[in-house]
Amino acid sequence: FIQANDMRPLADTANFIAVYPQGAIDPEGGTTSWIHKAPTDHDDIFFIEAIINELSTEYDIDQGRIYACGYSEGAIISYELGCRLNSRIAAFAAVSGSMLDDYYRDDIYGWGTCSPVHPTAMMLIPGTVDQNPHSTYEGLSYGDMPLYMSANDITTFWSSYNNTDAVPVITNVEDVSPNDGSTVERKVWLNGDNCSSVQELKVIGGDHDWPGVLGNMDIDATNEIWNFVSRFSIEGKLNCNISVNDFSFDKKQNLNSNTKDKY
């Protein structure tokens, strides 16, 4: 992940701590993929919580501004952190990876349903032609068993939980790279509890990529994510004067921050 998306230069200027964990080693086989088989007692959520606790003893971290993001399987674990470590996660983002359906999470893994405990801002950046089983735009089922949620189901879940406006504000991102074979539609659900919001950057024609590095070049996923999550704490939006323009990244804007956050 760090090879494709090195956030350290941004962390240096925006004053946050970038942490790149590797999935805990599975005692049965030695692999390090995130939550890759079920049923299992091998639970990466406990591992991430232990990392947060350990880093909190070494650094002066704002405990109200701990964020998560990930790509592919890392996106899946980001959703799980939003669901099952929600009391520690202020906001999160997922790129090219889907959210486990509650059937898969509960009946197969035995982790219970997704149960956040506070209004939680979240962003997803899916590609509409992504054919990886765990990240297809339309979701994935095996027979009558739902496994991974569609992008629409994900935004419905989080916008409903956050009690946002039912209808999103939709804008088209400028197609500054017409040769990349894709465009981006920005959908923002505003006015949630504690001024929370949900945002989808729908990459139309996008594949299993991290925009700005591979695939779509109209947006930079790294900057888009930080611009979004950094506006929230565990208690909600830092400034409740919400405008949809708040969520449109401008490369000219100042990303410097006076707080040290874990990301």
What are the functions of these language-model segments?
Residues 165-168, 236-262:
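Residue-level detector of functionally pivotal "anchor" positions at catalytic/ligand-binding pockets or at interdomain
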Residues 90-91, 96-182, 188-195:
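The feature captures the conserved acid-bearing segment of alpha/beta-hydrolase catalytic domains
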Residues 1-67, 71, 80, 84, ...:
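Serine-hydrolase catalytic machinery in alpha/beta-hydrolase-like enzymes
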Residues 217-239:
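Catalytic active-site module of serine/aspartate enzymes centered on a nucleophile-bearing elbow/loop
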Residues 205-209:
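Histidine-bearing beta->alpha loop at or near hydrolase active sites
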